[in-house]
Design a protein with these regions (language model features):
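Leucine-rich tandem repeat or coiled-coil scaffolds
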Residues: 1-269
C-alpha cells in the first residue's frame, strides 16, 4: 500500500492531473494514511476528489488533515462518516473556498452536523450543490438547513438567505435549483408574497411589521415596482409555470389599495 501511495504521489505532481478517485480501498495503517493525506495536500493541480466506501476513520483523517481549500468537488459518499461534534465540514464550507460540489450522502451525519452546516451556509459561499441524503438528519437539522436557504420569517431574512446552494437528497427540496443566484432570490421572494396573498392574510400586515421607520412610506413605490419586475424576471427565466396560481394584478392591487398609499400622497402634498 505504501509503495502504491508513493507512486500515486509522483503522478499527482503532474499539473495535468485534475481529479482522483479512490473507491473501496480502505487504508488500514495509520502511517500509510498520514502518507496519503500528505499526498493529497501536495497534489499540484488536484481540484476533484472522490473518496467513497473507505470508512469513517479514513474520511475523518482527510477532513482533519488535508488542505481542502483548493478543491472544487469533493465526494465523501457512503463512508459511515460521523463527526462527533467536530466542525471540519462546516468550517470547510465557511472558508469561502472554490468548493462548488460537496457530496456527503449515505453517511452518519446528524442534526448537530446539519445545524453547523446550515450556519456555514449563512456566510457567502461558492458552493452550488450539497448532497446530504441518507444520513441521520431529522426534523431539527432539516429545518435548520431549509432556513439557511429559504428563511421565510420575513422578506429581509429571505433576501439574506443562501441563494446559490442546492440541497440535494432532502425530500421535496427544489430550492435553489436554478444556476442563477439572483433568479433564485427573485423567485423565492415572489413566491413568499404570492403565498401570503393566496392565504387570505395578504402582504400588507407583514410589510407594516417588516418595513418600519418614518421614511418607510418612501419605499412604497419601489416595493410595488419590484413586484412587477420580479414577475417579469421569473417569466424570462423560464419559471412561468410556478406563477400559474398567482395573479400579478391581485398582488399589485392589494398593495396599491391598502398599503401606504394615503400616507404617500399626504407626504407628497
Amino acid at each position: 500500500m505504501r509503495r502504491a501511495i508513493r507512486e500515486l504521489g509522483r503522478v499527482l505532481k503532474n499539473v495535468r492531473v485534475k481529479s482522483l478517485k479512490w473507491t473501496e480501498i480502505p487504508i488500514e495503517s495509520a502511517d500509510d494514511m498520514v502518507l496519503f493525506t500528505q499526498m493529497l495536500s501536495d497534489g499540484v493541480a488536484l481540484d476533484e476528489l472522490r473518496f467513497d466506501q473507505n470508512g469513517h476513520e479514513n474520511t475523518q483523517a482527510i477532513l482533519s488533515s488535508v488542505d481542502l481549500s483548493k478543491y472544487k468537488k469533493l465526494d465523501f459518499e457512503d463512508n459511515h462518516l460521523r463527526t462527533n461534534g467536530r466542525a471540519d465540514i462546516s468550517n470547510l464550507i465557511a472558508l469561502n473556498s472554490p468548493l462548488e460540489t460537496l457530496l456527503l450522502s449515505s453517511n452518519s451525519l446528524n442534526d448537530v452536523d446539519a445545524v453547523l452546516i446550515a450556519e456555514s451556509l449563512g456566510h457567502y459561499s461558492h458552493l452550488r450543490k450539497l448532497d446530504l441524503g441518507y444520513n441521520n438528519i431529522l426534523e431539527r437539522g432539516l429545518n435548520a438547513l431549509i432556513r439557511a436557504v429559504n428563511d421565510t420569517s420575513s422578506l429581509n431574512a429571505l433576501s439574506d438567505s443562501n441563494h446559490s446552494c442546492h440541497l440535494g437528497g432532502l425530500h421535496g427540496s427544489v430550492i435553489n435549483e436554478n444556476q442563477c443566484e439572483n433568479l433564485n432570490r427573485i423567485f423565492k421572494i415572489h413566491l413568499l408574497m404570492a403565498e401570503r396573498y393566496r392565504s387570505g392574510e395578504g402582504n400588507v400586515q407583514y410589510l407594516n411589521r417588516e418595513i418600519v421607520g418614518s421614511n418607510s412610506v418612501l419605499l412604497a413605490p419601489f416595493i410595488i415596482e419590484s413586484v412587477h419586475r420580479r414577475h417579469a424576471a421569473i417569466e424570462e427565466g423560464g419559471l412561468a409555470y410556478s406563477l400559474r396560481d398567482t395573479s400579478l394584478l391581485g398582488l399589485l392591487y392589494e398593495l396599491v389599495k391598502d398599503w401606504e398609499m394615503p400616507d404617500l400622497f399626504s407626504f407628497n402634498n
